[in-house]
């Protein structure tokens, strides 16, 4: 996590929690010539446009007061979407029983990408039940070896 995202997270967290929401993630990325500060929020039942506007206005005011970012940027507050990232222990716990996609830093059992049902999480390891052709296989992945993890939408 970069220093900017850490500072923004410390500013955004009290605002989001005061509104009984969860701060899912903060990203500060350059796309073409422009910088984007993306803040992802959620709550049980999901967030709507009014929630995003409310947090955007409060956060924008605080960011203007503290001015932690030197360059010009666009502030974007939104839901994490259907393919929500899994970063915190609570994200993994909530995802047990759901379809997930994970990518590891190095190959595990000959692969770096895994998609399937997250069947277990113990704080250090996740177990994903993947399907290889017609066989099901359980793969254990140490959390510290996971480069990217998110929910995965499936169309049946």
Curated annotation (Swiss-Prot):
GO terms for biological process: ribosomal small subunit assembly; translation. Belongs to the RimP family. Required for maturation of 30S ribosomal subunits. It is found in: Cytoplasm. This is Ribosome maturation factor RimP. Coiled coil: none annotated. One of its GO terms (cellular component) is cytosol. It comes from Exiguobacterium sp. (strain ATCC BAA-1283 / AT1b). Keywords: Cytoplasm, Ribosome biogenesis.
